[in-house]
Amino acid sequence: MSEEQQTVNIKKKEKWGVAHIYASYNNTIIHITDLTGAETISKWSGGMVVKADRDESSPYAAMIAARRAAEEAMEKGINGVHIKVRAPGGSKSKNPGPGAQAAIRALARAGLRIGRVEDVTPIPHDGTRPKGGRRGRRV
């Protein structure tokens, strides 16, 4: 076998980051950091990419913000991310907003490898009193 026929398997060096996705019903924030979370690599929000305030939390805004964050991260050498999804939590809503799923899908389609996806919504262990009064919100 000649040297030309031997293929050298050069393994591409993988550099991982963490994509923190905060999805509320008012906005979606995509924040890509290094693995420790100490250094910000890219940060985009739904409000940065759309004009109307009502569209900040939409899946479309989340998709564009995630795509731009992924492009910026890939320029800086990140080629895989672990995803941490967070809703407002605490005494507020514990469900992620409409942009969370769209943001995850956009990160994957932008060419980033997806590692773990985990929910890091803060859950109270009997913390502060929820708003609405003793009898709750009467609709």
UniProtKB/Swiss-Prot annotation:
GO aspect biological process, one term: translation
Start and end residues of each stretch annotated as Disordered: 118-139
GO cellular component, one term: ribonucleoprotein complex
Keywords of the record: Ribonucleoprotein, Ribosomal protein, RNA-binding, rRNA-binding
InterPro entries: Ribosomal_uS11, Ribosomal_uS11_archaeal, Ribosomal_uS11_CS, Ribosomal_uS11_sf
Record's keyword annotation contains NADP: no
A Pfam family it matches: Ribosomal_S11
A single MF term (Gene Ontology): rRNA binding
Transferase in keyword set: no
Gene3D superfamilies: Ribosomal protein S11 (3.30.420.80)
HAMAP family in alphabetical order: Ribosomal_uS11
Stated family: Belongs to the universal ribosomal protein uS11 family.
PANTHER family hit by this protein: 40S RIBOSOMAL PROTEIN S14/30S RIBOSOMAL PROTEIN S11
Subunit structure: Part of the 30S ribosomal subunit.
Function: Located on the platform of the 30S subunit.
Name of the protein in question: Small ribosomal subunit protein uS11
Lineage, uppermost ranks: Archaea, Methanobacteriati, Methanobacteriota, Thermococci, Thermococcales
